[in-house]
């Protein structure tokens, strides 16, 4: 509202993680706005931040207004609501190349934080249906995990949106008309909404993340 723009609802998919890797998501108990401001001023906000140990394949949903941070040792794919706004409330006193502390947005952030919705959560994955696991379905995007071990027709007609296919394990060849594209681990391709189908050929057991907008 401050800038006349959207909030930033997000989803995190952990691609890889070191043994001691963790994220920060929400608070570890209810924190009032007044307590938040006091802790920020005295430098002990970290005491009430909720830390989650992470491992490869974990999925987290971050609603707009929730305090969050990706910490060291994490390689994460982020899907988010379209927004150009990020409020930084704490930066571990890190400095840029010129020795300056990065800008913080403490006053703006305290207006944006939803202090009533303070508990983050890891998503409990449901059993696969025909090789597809729905990870997140919200008003801003849908993300599915596709497990592919043999060639298959990929029907795009029911999806009234562009589609992002992200290879998170293995690699595949995408074929359509007389053309093809190879997608390897760590790569993403955008499929235009006008395309109705293509053929997916995995070379090894493969996991793809399918992301689109629910229209």
Q: For the regions a protein language model found, what residue spans apply to each?
A:
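Active-site region of the double-stranded beta-helix
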Residues: 1-56, 71-171, 175-176, 181, ...
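Conserved metal-binding segment of the jelly-roll/cupin
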Residues: 53-72, 81, 183-197
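Sequence termini and other peripheral, non-core segments
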Residues: 186, 199, 208-214
């Amino acid at each position: 509202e401050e800038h006349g723009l959207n909030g930033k609802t997000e989803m995190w998919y952990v691609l890889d993680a070191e043994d001691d890797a963790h994220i920060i998501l929400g608070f570890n108990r209810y924190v009032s706005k007044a307590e938040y401001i006091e802790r920020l001023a005295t430098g002990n906000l970290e005491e009430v931040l909720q830390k989650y140990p992470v491992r490869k394949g974990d999925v987290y949903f971050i609603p707009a207004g929730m305090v969050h941070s990706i910490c060291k040792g994490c390689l994460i794919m982020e899907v988010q609501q379209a927004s150009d706004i990020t409020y930084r409330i704490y930066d571990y006193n890190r400095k840029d190349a010129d020795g300056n502390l990065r800008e913080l947005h403490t006053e703006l952030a305290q207006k944006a934080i939803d202090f009533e919705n303070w508990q983050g959560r890891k998503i409990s994955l449901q059993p696969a249906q025909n090789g597809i696991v729905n990870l997140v379905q919200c008003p801003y995007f849908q993300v599915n995990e596709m497990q592919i071990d043999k060639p298959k027709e990929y029907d795009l007609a029911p999806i009234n949106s562009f589609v992002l296919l992200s290879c998170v394990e293995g690699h595949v060849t995408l074929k359509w008309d007389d053309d093809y594209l190879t997608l390897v681990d760590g790569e993403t391709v955008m499929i235009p909404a006008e395309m109705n189908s293509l053929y997916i050929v995995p070379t090894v057991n493969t996991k793809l993340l399918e992301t689109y907008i629910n229209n």
